Every structure is written in C-alpha cells, then in structure tokens.
Amino acid sequence: MVQPCSAYGCKNRYDKDKPVSFHKFPLTRPSLCKEWEAAVRRKNFKPTKYSSICSEHFTPDCFKRECNNKLLKENAVPTIFLCTEPHDKKEDLEPQEQLPPPPLPPPVSQVDAAIGLLMPPLQTPVNLSVFCDHNYTVEDTMHQRKRIHQLEQQVEKLRKKLKTAQQRCRRQERQLEKLKEVVHFQKEKDNVSERGYVILPNDYFEIVEVPA
C-alpha cells in the first residue's frame, strides 16, 4: 500500500528513490501525538497506525544528524505547512461583541395638575437598585464605625490594666529591696554578736585627775 502524507494539500507519497522520509504519528505518546494533530490542523482528523507525515514538514533541527536525517528526535513536532484545510464560514466569523443597552433617559419630574405641585420623579428599577446599594453602603459604614469604637474601648481597658500591673510590679520590687536590706542588716548584726564584743556601761571607767 502506497503511504501518503497526512498533511493537507501535500501530495508526497512514499518512494524509496526519493529523499523524502515518512514518519508515523506517535500514537504511543498521547501528549506528543496531540501536538502533531494540532500542527496538522485538519478538521475531524484522527490518526491511525497507518497515518504519517513526510520529512518536508519538519525543520532540520528535528532530525538526528548521526542518522542522516532519517530519524526524528524524541520530541520533534512538524511545523512546516504551506496549505491548511479551509474552515466553514460560520466558524471563521468572530462573534460580534454585544453592545451595552442605551442609557435610560433621566426621570422627568411631573406636575400634578390638581394641586399644581412639582412631583418627584418616579423610582425606576435602576434608581431603586442604586438607592438600595447606597443603603447597604451606609449600613456597612455605620457597622464598621461601631466596631472600631468597640475595639478602641477594649484597647483603652487593656492599657489601664497594663498600667495597673506595672505599678503593682514596681511596688513589689520596692518591697523586695526593703526585705533585702533587712536581711543584710540582720546578717551584719549576727556577725557582730559572734565576734564577742561586750558593750560596757558609761560609768564603768573612773576619771582620775593627774596633778600638774
């Protein structure tokens, strides 16, 4: 069976006398095979074990030089296609962008003929939606302000508690210093007692007058 090239518009067929080599689709490597299918760009084309692409659709760097440009590299993909299969006109037409609806005319104030007063414009659905959105925004802002006020109060309470704790720590430090002084004084007193000093009364010594 003569082996044709699967590329659209390519008329090459296998001929051992021509320097054109044919390379089958890598069906055993699905990801690489999908790249080949995408490169061919043929609608509803599914390669089979007989489908192949001729060497004219590959760039020179896709071939192994040591094999005389007859074997493809592992990740080679065909990229040279002079002809592509035409698509349907419906597919070629790009979807037109949908234009936004024209803006609604501004509401016109009405005059009540019975009382001669200028009446406010009727609330259209657009106006109602804007009004509702504005209400939601105001409510969210008020809620956020209330929450911020609550957080500020909590911070103030924590600041007061911290100040009280710091004062308590300073008092305890002063008490500790006093206790250290008392202990030091008591140790000094005990050391004096151990040395055996005797405190004599003031009238123990007599004053002797020495004649001149």
Curated annotation (Swiss-Prot):
Keywords: Cell cycle, Coiled coil, DNA-binding, Metal-binding, Nucleus, Transcription, Transcription regulation, Zinc, Zinc-finger. The keyword Flavoprotein does not apply. A motif (HCFC1-binding motif (HBM)) lies at residues 133-136. Pfam families: THAP. Residues 138-189 form a coiled coil. InterPro entries: THAP1/10, THAP_Znf, THAP_Znf_sf. A zinc finger (THAP-type) spans 5-57. One of its GO terms (biological process) is regulation of transcription by RNA polymerase II. It is found in: Nucleus, Nucleoplasm; Nucleus, PML body. GO terms for molecular function: DNA-binding transcription factor activity; protein homodimerization activity; RNA polymerase II cis-regulatory region sequence-specific DNA binding; sequence-specific DNA binding; zinc ion binding. One of its GO terms (cellular component) is PML body. Belongs to the THAP1 family. Interacts with PAWR. Component of a THAP1/THAP3-HCFC1-OGT complex that contains, either THAP1 or THAP3, HCFC1 and OGT. Interacts with OGT. Interacts (via the HBM) with HCFC1 (via the Kelch-repeat domain); the interaction recruits HCFC1 to the RRM1 promoter. DNA-binding transcription regulator that regulates endothelial cell proliferation and G1/S cell-cycle progression. Specifically binds the 5'-[AT]NTNN[GT]GGCA[AGT]-3' core DNA sequence and acts by modulating expression of pRB-E2F cell-cycle target genes, including RRM1. Component of a THAP1/THAP3-HCFC1-OGT complex that is required for the regulation of the transcriptional activity of RRM1. May also have pro-apoptotic activity by potentiating both serum-withdrawal and TNF-induced apoptosis. This is THAP domain-containing protein 1.
